[in-house]
């Protein structure tokens, strides 16, 4: 009987820890009856679980009689030890640039001691869809894409890394001397960034959108299938060899947003949000990324 009680209390502690991670110090907590109902447990067992969290130093509660109970102190790291996080899976772009490799390597290094895995997939739309469906725990996208997704419910912007952490710079690529004669622009419909930036750049212009794969973009311009694409320029010499030229994208803040990496979680996944806050040192992550980009360090992810 005692063993069964301990097992049940452990389940209740996990549920309470997940709830408390979504609260802030100073908040009035739900009543013990409400918590017992959410934990699908008895009031006595819920009280015992709450006392266990208090005695462990994870939280401190101030009880004010009829005015309720208030959370006055909380230790996120201590609470996280009571949450059942066996591993973390992050949806990430395909690592075809040193910047992506550095980001993947740097983020993984922050989760030292926690099993951390990547699911590499092309297209922010599919990464976010898998996140919302509970397939993965977090997703890396650009701030530009994130802003479009955050208009729908269910997502939380959990980590922001600043400009030029996702890509260096997007530019308009076309054949030399033909930037003023763009009639057909290539567009990979799986790329939220490219769709938004193409709409921003061309606005109401009478330009035909031609569906293509992002990684075929340059060759399709060379062949004459399209006149231009908005593309992340990694190697300028490659453009020169192909007879292409690049025009910087300016005059709209959304072009800069497309260069910033952010991490999304589900809005109700408080443990994952707190885990990111607890373990990620942004400066160390970005320094790691830059060492990979410069070749000082080999990526590991």
Swiss-Prot record:
CDD domains: PBP2_Yhfz. Coiled coil: none annotated. It comes from the Bacteria. InterPro entries: HTH_41, YhfZ_C. This is Uncharacterized protein YhfZ. The gene is yhfZ.
